[in-house]
């Protein structure tokens, strides 16, 4: 059992699948009981979780480190249960120490001043095979350092850290199964393994049993909206996507000047060789030409181009701070300061990316768009890649990529009176971060009547606190931005609040809604106090409800429900206003619908009106040419939170200036908050902060 609701059984029919890097994937089942109309329902779903591969800790640590440069020993070993091979004790790894067995010295009663390596040779006649791997601390209050090769990982332990990108790619291959396969697994294995075949004694006492078939619930399919560009109206296909060929943006942005930063980082096979590389110059001309054809006003002058030759990767500098310093020295050479810098990355190094965004957003106030050299220079699919980058560029320049057709019902409703759509999200530090690392809150809202431009307000707050502390101030900032751009205040405000579990809905009503109303009091209208109609909808994707069509005519080609499928009966709340909506077409596996739950409604939506509006706005996500799985304002808030994580990158990777890698016992929360505020500073500098910088 993992957590409260996930169950995994070791079975020859479903053996673990190796993910590489010391981990393996186990497939199991999630189960919970949910109230429904006149009955209880058992919510069962398949689930896949990463477990440690049993074996020698040093071997598995080495496999983990070999899998990616971004891998760090502490991220793998912290919290794992082991058995010591020399004494047979069972211990938990508290952390990975920075010292090596052949360097760390201590005083031994028997042998005097010795290294750990010497001690184990003299005491146990053990010659260490991995003297280059750091020691692990398996002590309690007092440190007890051991070489990892003297520890065996115990079986059946879930991995609670953050998966490497390489692990995630393998995990997707294991976990992604179409709905018919997952449904068969639940019926054929899940019910039996969860013990639902026969009623238990307590269930019999209450006359209860669990059905053997999937519940059938009614649903409907909403039509896709018509999409409008400045030139051309693409057809939305059955997968809720469309093509940008021969399309001009609805409103093109203006780029006054631009620079190009070429990062050179030891990936010579895919990198451009220098700022004067003819292939680079041709690529930039091709990109600029596509931007012009798409409606963006490009500067007549060629861009300034500089290169940054990054220092070699060094485990003594795990976050690559020296590389970021090199990048800074290159960017400041761009003179005069450009409106935007196109950064051509060498690879997907997340430390370089996070450091770059932190530098440019918070310190330099320079807008950036990042591309990877291996993708932008590849001839096959190059125009499509250019177009995808242009989507982001136009939005960062204040343009409008596409809108809903003027005859669309949702479009007409949105323009009946001034309306502001708001997205709110909070992201929290996970396992392996410095204890006390703040959570990050973001609020986005449209400033225009095309519902295209959604600048963001962001704050850090107490670690793992769900309620948004500074919501009043951030809402006031969004209202002021709306007022400046639209020359009026919105009379209706529709909030999509992401990231709230069902048990915390009351926090939004009791704590956050009053803060929103406090923001209203900071504004006045000609008629008196400002009091717009407010509706709050909570969005949730962390649930285990999945749908599978009972009739092929309602199914997409991959067996999932067709885009636009909405369910508001059978598995929804008994007395509340909620629904499940799958606006998007699935990429692979079983598609997850989003659960929308109305917790406050002054606008007085009908079910059909809100469902249709939410579906249509899911087609308004600016950097895509398809409907997205989460309504656009909430999606934007999620992206803004993710950008905020770049600014706290070291703390989120378990490293603090308070003294190396720390645990909760060592890190005082106020010290960490102070360190985080030093990283965050005043947030994103203007004028970058007034744009959709987070795309």
Give a label for each model feature.
Residues 1-695:
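Long, low-complexity, intrinsically disordered terminal regions
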């Amino acid at each position: 059992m993992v957590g409260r609701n996930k169950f995994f059984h070791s079975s020859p029919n479903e053996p673990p699948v190796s993910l590489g890097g010391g981990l393996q994937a186990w497939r199991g089942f999630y189960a919970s009981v949910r109230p429904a109309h006149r009955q209880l329902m058992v919510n069962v779903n398949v689930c896949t979780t990463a477990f440690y591969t049993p074996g020698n800790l040093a071997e598995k640590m080495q496999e983990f480190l070999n899998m990616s440069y971004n891998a760090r020993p502490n991220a793998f070993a912290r919290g794992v249960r082991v058995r010591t091979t020399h004494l047979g004790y069972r211990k938990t790894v508290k952390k990975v120490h920075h010292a090596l067995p052949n360097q760390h010295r201590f005083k031994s009663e028997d042998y005097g001043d010795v290294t750990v390596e010497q001690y184990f040779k003299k005491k146990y006649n053990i010659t260490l095979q991995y003297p280059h791997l750091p020691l692990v601390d398996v002590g309690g209050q007092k440190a007890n350092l051991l070489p990892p090769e003297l520890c065996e990982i115990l079986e059946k332990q879930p991995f609670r850290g953050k998966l490497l990108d390489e692990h995630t790619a393998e995990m997707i291959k294991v976990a992604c199964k179409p709905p018919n396969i997952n449904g068969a697994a639940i019926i054929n294995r899940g019910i039996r393994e969860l013990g639902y075949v026969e009623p238990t004694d307590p269930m019999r006492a209450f006359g209860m049993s669990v059905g053997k078939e999937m519940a059938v619930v009614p649903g409907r399919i909403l039509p896709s909206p018509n999409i409008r560009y400045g030139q051309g109206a693409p057809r939305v296909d059955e997968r809720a996507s469309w093509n940008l060929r021969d399309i001009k943006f609805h409103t093109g942005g203006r780029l006054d000047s631009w620079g190009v930063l070429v990062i050179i980082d030891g990936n010579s096979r895919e990198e451009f060789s220098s700022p004067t590389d003819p292939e680079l110059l041709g690529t930039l001309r091709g990109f600029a030409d596509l931007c012009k054809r798409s409606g963006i006003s490009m500067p007549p002058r060629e861009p300034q181009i500089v290169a940054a030759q990054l220092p070699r990767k060094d485990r003594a500098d795990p976050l690559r701070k020296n590389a970021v310093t090199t990048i800074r020295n290159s960017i400041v050479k761009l003179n005069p300061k450009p409106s935007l810098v196109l950064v051509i990355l060498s690879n997907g190094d997340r430390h370089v990316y996070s450091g770059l965004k932190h530098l440019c957003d918070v310190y330099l106030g320079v807008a950036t768009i990042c591309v990877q050299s291996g993708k932008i220079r590849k001839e096959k699919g190059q125009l499509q890649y250019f177009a995808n980058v242009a989507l982001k560029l136009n939005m960062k320049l204040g343009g409008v990529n596409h809108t809903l057709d003027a005859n669309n019902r949702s479009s007409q409703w949105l323009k009946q009176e001034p309306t502001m759509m708001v997205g709110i999200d909070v992201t929290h530090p996970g396992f392996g971060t410095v204890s006390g690392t703040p959570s990050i809150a973001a609020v986005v809202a449209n400033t225009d009547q095309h519902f295209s431009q959604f600048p963001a307000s962001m704050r850090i707050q107490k670690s793992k606190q769900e309620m948004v502390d500074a919501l009043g101030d951030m809402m006031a900032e969004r209202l002021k931005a709306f007022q400046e751009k639209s020359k009026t205040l919105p009379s209706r405000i529709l909030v999509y609040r992401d990231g709230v579990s069902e048990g915390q809905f009351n926090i939004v009503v009791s704590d956050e809604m009053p803060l929103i109303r406090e923001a209203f009091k900071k504004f006045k209208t000609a008629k008196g106090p400002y009091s717009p109609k407010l509706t709050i909808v909570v969005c949730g994707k962390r649930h285990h409800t999945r749908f599978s069509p009972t009739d092929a005519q309602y199914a997409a080609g991959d067996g999932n429900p067709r885009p636009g499928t909405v369910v508001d009966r059978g598995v929804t709340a008994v007395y509340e206003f909620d629904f499940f909506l799958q606006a998007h077409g699935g990429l692979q596996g079983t598609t997850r619908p989003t659960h929308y739950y109305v917790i406050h409604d002054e606008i007085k939506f009908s079910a059909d009106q809100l469902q249709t509006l939410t579906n249509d706005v899911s087609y308004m996500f600016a950097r895509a040419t398809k409907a997205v799985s989460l309504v656009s304002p909430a999606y934007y808030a999620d992206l803004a939170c993710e950008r905020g994580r770049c600014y706290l990158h070291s703390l989120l990777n378990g490293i603090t200036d308070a003294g190396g890698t720390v645990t909760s016992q060592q890190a005082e929360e106020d010290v960490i908050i102070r360190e985080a505020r030093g990283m965050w500073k005043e947030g994103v500098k203007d004028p970058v902060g007034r744009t959709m910088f987070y795309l």
